[in-house]
């Protein structure tokens, strides 16, 4: 009887020990894959993304692990880097440019992808903004609205603007998104010359062609390739005294006349919201893609002076930042 009781006690102790061991096992730490184009260019935005994640309780190295993979301007590496993240079995992939979103989309149909691009429907990433329908969701902005505003602001800066060159690269989203700029220009009564660049050496040829055609300004279409080679572009714009509306604030800091764009720091913060939803079990197919509500209009007054442009006060008052 005593022997049987001892065995029962031992069995109970073993069960309790097993239960404690199970409870003591650490919870699975979510792993986020970040597929980026350029670590230097996106450093500020990544910091904003991480800061917002902390507000949701996610701290890199403690409550989450973020696996970064950077192409550093080499688009041919994106497929390999996306495959690495898939092999790591990350819980979600975050990415923010058409080429990198495309690479992630091709690498997996099951791992959720949180992205930000312009015109995700036109580029085939989602079926609809309200119901994406696949494994991709995030934040997006529409070319048509931004293009019209950018051209209108450039027209306010350049008197009698009737001819404009549009600089583009296919890796920025393709011709479909360039058409939005063309349509916006025609709406404003502006003639358009399309100039595609594929290699760094194409910039000088393109700007020379724009000047020969009689372009009074240039609109730069969003493109990771152009961003990578922006110094070449900005040098050519300065040498040819051509006013331009560029893609990002960084261009304006470095010498472009102006930019009107969604506030990308705020967009990257917003991506943390989507990551939180997914880590809590939401399906990307059911998470509506939202559109930014905050935009920045940055003007370089020094560049305007070098171009001989007297920017009207009505234009400067619209700016969120004036670089002097």
Per-range role (PLM):
Residues 1-324:
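Short hydrophobic alpha-helices and adjacent helix-cap/hinge residues
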């Amino acid at each position: 009887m005593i022997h049987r009781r001892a065995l029962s006690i031992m069995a109970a102790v073993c069960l309790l020990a097993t239960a404690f061991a199970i409870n003591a096992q650490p919870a699975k730490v979510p792993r986020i894959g970040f597929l980026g184009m350029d670590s230097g260019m996106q450093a500020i935005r990544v910091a904003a993304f991480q800061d917002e994640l902390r507000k949701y309780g996610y701290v890199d190295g403690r409550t989450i692990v973020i696996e970064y993979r950077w192409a550093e301007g080499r688009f041919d590496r994106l497929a390999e880097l996306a495959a690495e993240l898939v092999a790591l079995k990350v819980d979600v992939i975050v990415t923010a440019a058409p080429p990198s979103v495309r690479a992630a989309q091709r690498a997996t149909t099951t791992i959720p992808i949180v992205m930000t691009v312009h015109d995700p429907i036109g580029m085939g990433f989602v079926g609809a903004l309200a119901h994406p329908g696949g494994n991709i969701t995030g934040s997006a902005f529409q070319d048509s609205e931004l293009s019209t505003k950018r051209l209108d602001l450039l027209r306010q800066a350049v008197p009698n603007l009737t001819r404009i060159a549009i600089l583009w690269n296919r890796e920025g989203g393709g011709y479909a998104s360039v058409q939005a700029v063309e349509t916006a220009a025609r709406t404003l009564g502006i003639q358009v010359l399309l100039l595609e660049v594929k290699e760094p050496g194409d910039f000088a040829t393109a700007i020379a062609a724009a000047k020969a055609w009689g372009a009074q300004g240039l609109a730069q279409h969003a493109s990771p390739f152009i961003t990578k080679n922006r110094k070449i572009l900005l040098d050519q714009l300065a040498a040819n005294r051509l006013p331009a509306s560029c893609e990002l604030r960084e261009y304006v800091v470095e010498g472009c006349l102006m930019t009107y764009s969604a506030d990308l720091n705020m967009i990257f913060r917003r991506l943390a919201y989507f990551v939180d939803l997914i880590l809590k079990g939401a399906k990307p197919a059911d998470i509506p893609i939202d559109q930014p509500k905050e935009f920045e209009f940055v003007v370089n007054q020094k560049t305007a002076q070098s171009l001989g442009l007297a920017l009207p006060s009505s234009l400067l008052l619209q700016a969120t930042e004036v670089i002097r």
